[in-house]
């Protein structure tokens, strides 16, 4: 029988509910429990696929092709369990499901209302498909008091009564700010947040209190008294140097013990955290440092590249080096020489993106890396720009471009209109909807034997996650390969180019997929481990 942990947030947003949920999942998993993590997002979008990266941050793609919240990336990285499309739902998706049912007549003429129809839809989502799990951790997006979150709060309140007694625990993550003028940590914001939650009928079992310094015992007792929780259930969540310290920090504070106690479970056996200790030790005691330039177009919000950042750090963990990131807005290179920005870095990474803005800057970055023999990693759009650069400057195709930017004389990159997913032929047109219509999720690729990328993977058959609607035009393959660019990986049917590389370059690889989505701190992705290894070698030359 599954037990449910509901994690809510108060006082301010961005406190780290996703990290808290992921860390708790890792701790329970380290005790041998089977854990599932789910995210409930209050916004009205059906999914984040069409949302601006500078507003929402990264769109995390699952193996089964769902475009989801970036917190699912944290869940995967901390637990190693691959998320699915059934692990994330939004208000938009819920209302769409309900409206579809109403149009079909499923409600038999009833007046469709928030209670019970919306709340029932939420409850069904939370409780379905959990028979193989010991714990289901549900993170509620937003902050207590947000009008958008009200149906979710009501649904989890009802679940407290619907589920068997003792199978639901509520954890409230809140902030205890330090006021320099008073020289004190203040409990009042947390008190008011809990009162707001209690007014909704939810009484938290555990308070997880964010603070930038130790919380005095007297303040903990005060929170216990006014928030109606046991003293042992007031758990401080102090700032840490890196997010991979969080599981051990929370274990030290007793979060997992307290959660188990709230369920009436003896907190044994102790979690096996030796792998986490090794990861954190490597982060704390690096044997070197490399600088990686990320030439992107959404650098104003680092969360737009969340999985990418983490995957680079995983590569650092694998090589026992610290990875320093230099963020460069790609449009800069459309006006300025890239050399002053790039000549001191040890590796260049051009990530995914959409649209013409900044594309020429990415092409200049790819040319610099190719000519100067600097390790280059092009992901999705970054691979496409590297191919356009090769077409223009090596294959004598000066008008090489992408149809994503408009009509092109030489469409080296073009819209995919047909591809195979499983046994089904997928078809798209330029006039179709944007949402959910890309090549999404895990696809297999066949790597050419003897290439660098096949050696890195240790295999010629791979599966990686995709999120794109444009693809390198195979009609230019022979012309480009005659100039030294190797198409080292193709879709199994030989139609879609998946990876490229230069054999005469120390490390120049482009991939059409997103390998960062499958990297873990306990299991770094081989491409990122190899890229950072190459950057480490480059650091000895610069």
Curated annotation (Swiss-Prot):
Allosterically activated by GTP, when glutamine is the substrate; GTP has no effect on the reaction when ammonia is the substrate. The allosteric effector GTP functions by stabilizing the protein conformation that binds the tetrahedral intermediate(s) formed during glutamine hydrolysis. Inhibited by the product CTP, via allosteric rather than competitive inhibition. It comes from the Bacteria. Its EC number is 6.3.4.2. The keyword Magnesium applies. Residues 1-265 are annotated as: Amidoligase domain. L-glutamine binds at residues 353, 381-384, 404, 469. It catalyses: UTP + L-glutamine + ATP + H2O = CTP + L-glutamate + ADP + phosphate + 2 H(+); L-glutamine + H2O = L-glutamate + NH4(+); UTP + NH4(+) + ATP = CTP + ADP + phosphate + 2 H(+). ATP binds at residues 14-19, 71. Residues 291-541 form the Glutamine amidotransferase type-1 domain. CDD domains: CTPS_N (cd03113), GATase1_CTP_Synthase (cd01746). GO terms for biological process: 'de novo' CTP biosynthetic process; pyrimidine nucleobase biosynthetic process. UTP binds at residues 13, 186-191, 222. The keyword DNA repair does not apply. The active site is at 380 (nucleophile), 514, 516. Keywords: ATP-binding, Glutamine amidotransferase, Ligase, Magnesium, Metal-binding, Nucleotide-binding, Pyrimidine biosynthesis. Pathway: Pyrimidine metabolism; CTP biosynthesis via de novo pathway; CTP from UDP: step 2/2. InterPro entries: Class_I_gatase-like, CTP_synthase, CTP_synthase_N, GATASE, GATase1_CTP_Synthase, P-loop_NTPase. Mg(2+) binds at residues 71, 139. One of its GO terms (cellular component) is cytosol. CTPSs have evolved a hybrid strategy for distinguishing between UTP and CTP. The overlapping regions of the product feedback inhibitory and substrate sites recognize a common feature in both compounds, the triphosphate moiety. To differentiate isosteric substrate and product pyrimidine rings, an additional pocket far from the expected kinase/ligase catalytic site, specifically recognizes the cytosine and ribose portions of the product inhibitor. HAMAP family: PyrG (MF_01227). This is CTP synthase. It comes from Rhizobium etli (strain CIAT 652).
